[in-house]
C-alpha cells in the first residue's frame, strides 16, 4: 500500500484535511500544537495510507513533536508529500514548502483557507504559482471539504512521471561547499545526489537532527567544510546568508502571484483582540464566559437532562431488567450483581452524559472559534511569574477534556525543563472524569450556585498548578523563562459538522470508559461489598470493602469525610475518577435510603467541598500515570507525579476543612 504524508505549518488545517481525505476523525483545534505525533489513516477509495505529521515551521526541529517530522522524512518510506499551506499567510508558509521542495520528492501543494484569504481581500494566481514551481497546486477549504474530493482523486497519480527539478542557487561559495559535501555524503552513505544535496543544505543550516543521522566521521568532514565556508561568506553566518537568499527567492516567486489589500485596513480579528486580550479586562471576560458555560451545563440545560436520564435508568430501565431476570429465573446472586452492582455503578456515571456533552460542546466551540489561542496569549503574562510561558497553557487547556492528551501535547514545548514542568502540573487540570463527582455534590449541596462552585474548582486547579510550577522552576527544574511566540488564528464561525464530531468523539470516549473501567470497577466494588471474612452475601458492614474503607477513612478523618464509605471510594479513583461516583452509588444505595439521602446525612456543604478539593488534586488516574511515564522516560518523575499531588491534596484539604470548621 502506498504511503503519503501530509505536512505544513501549525494550524493550517492538516488534521482537517486528514479527516476529509480518510473519513476518520482526529481532534481538531483552531490553534497550533494539536498534532504532536504522527497519525495514520486509510485514504478513501483505497488510494493508500495517509500520515498526518505534527505542524512545523522548519525542518530543523526545536521540539519533540517537530523531531517526528524530520525523522519521518529521513527514515521512512513514502510515495509523496501533500504540503498544505495557509493561503492567507502564503509567504510565511512558503518557508517550509521550499525546504520540502528541496527534498526533490513527489509533492502536491494544498492551498487551504482560500475562503479566509478571499475575505481578507488577498488574491492568489495559483495557476501562475503552479507553473513557476512546476508542482501541482490544489485549492481547498479543508474545514468544509471543498476541493478535497478532487485532491483525493489525484493523489493516486502523485509521483507519476516525476522528475527532480527544484534547486535554489545559494551563491558560488556556498554552492561549491554543497557540491563537496554531496560527494562525501554519496561516498560514505547510500543517499543519491538529490538526498545528498538536501542533507548538505540542512547541515549548513545547523539542523542537528541531520547531524544525528550521520556517523561521526562524516559529521567531522562536513563540519570542516562548513567552518571553511563560514570564513568566506560576508554575512554574519552561513545560515543567515542562506536564509536571506531563500527569503529573496520566495519574495520574487510571489511578487506577481499574490495581491494584498491596503495595509491600513484593520481586520475584525484585530479589533476583537484588543478587547479579549486586554491585560485588564481580558481575564474577567474569560471567567465570565466560563461561568456562562458552567451555568448552562449545570443549571439551564445539562442538569435537567441528566435528571430525566437518572429517572429513566433508576426507574423504568432497572425495573424492566428486574422483571426480565425474574421471568428468566436468574439466580439471586446474578440479579444483585446486575442491578446493585453494574446498573447502579455504571448507570450512576452515565446519567451525567448530558452534562458532559453540553460542556464539551461549548469547549469545542471556544476552540474552533480561535478564542482559546487568545487565552494562551493572555495567560502568558501571568505564567511568566510562575516560571512558565503561554505555550504551557495550551496543554493545560486540553487537560480540561482529559489529562492524557494534555501531557502528550507538552511535546510542542521546546524548553525541556518547561516541558517536564508542564507534564507534572497537567494532572491538576480538572478533566471530564472529575465532572460526575462535582455534578453529584453540587446538585445536592449547592443547588443555587452550582456553576460558581464548579468554576471555583477549575480555577483552584489552575492556581495550584501555577504554585507548584513556581516551586519546581525555582528548585529541581530551574530554567530561564522562554519567549512565547504563537500565531493567532483567524476568528471563524465554527463548523456545525466539526462541533458535532468533536463533541460526539469526546462523549463517546466517556461512554466507552463507562463500559470498560467503570464496568470493571463496579463489579469489583460490588463483589467486595458482597463478600467478607465470614462468607458471601454478608452485611456490607462486615464485608472486605468495609475493612478497606475503614482504613482509608481513618486516614482522611481530619479532612472532614472520614467515613469508611468515603474512604472506600478513593482507592478505585486511581483506576478512573468516574469510578468514585459508581462506587458511591453501590455503597450508599445498598441500604434502604437512597444515594442522595445518605450523602446528605454523611456530608455537610463544608465537607462536600473539601471532598471535591481532594478529588481534584489527589493522585492522577492510571492512564495519566502511564502517559507521564511514557513522556518522561523516568520512573523517578512518574513517582513524583503520583506522590506530590497526594500530599498537596491532603494538606490543602486539611487546611480548608479545619479553618472552615472554625466559622461554620
Curated annotation (Swiss-Prot):
It is found in: Cell membrane. GTP 2 binds at residues 33-37. This is Fe(2+) transporter FeoB. PROSITE patterns: G_FEOB. One of its GO terms (molecular function) is GTP binding. GTP 3 binds at residues 52-55. Its main location: membrane. GTP binds at residues 112-115, 141-143. It comes from Staphylococcus aureus (strain MRSA252). InterPro entries: Fe2_transport_prot-B (IPR003373), Fe2_transport_prot_B_C (IPR011640), FeoB_Cyto (IPR041069), FeoB_GTPase (IPR050860), G_FEOB_dom (IPR030389), Gate_dom (IPR011642), P-loop_NTPase (IPR027417). It is a multi-pass membrane protein. GTP 1 binds at residues 8-15. The gene is feoB. One of its GO terms (cellular component) is plasma membrane. Pfam families: FeoB_C, FeoB_Cyto, FeoB_N, Gate. Residues 1-161 form the FeoB-type G domain. The keyword Translocase does not apply. The chain crosses the membrane at residues 281-301, 342-362, 382-402, 425-445, 452-472, 516-536, 544-564, 567-587, 608-628, 637-657. Belongs to the TRAFAC class TrmE-Era-EngA-EngB-Septin-like GTPase superfamily. FeoB GTPase (TC 9.A.8) family. Keywords: Cell membrane, GTP-binding, Ion transport, Iron, Iron transport, Membrane, Nucleotide-binding, Transmembrane, Transmembrane helix, Transport. Probable transporter of a GTP-driven Fe(2+) uptake system.
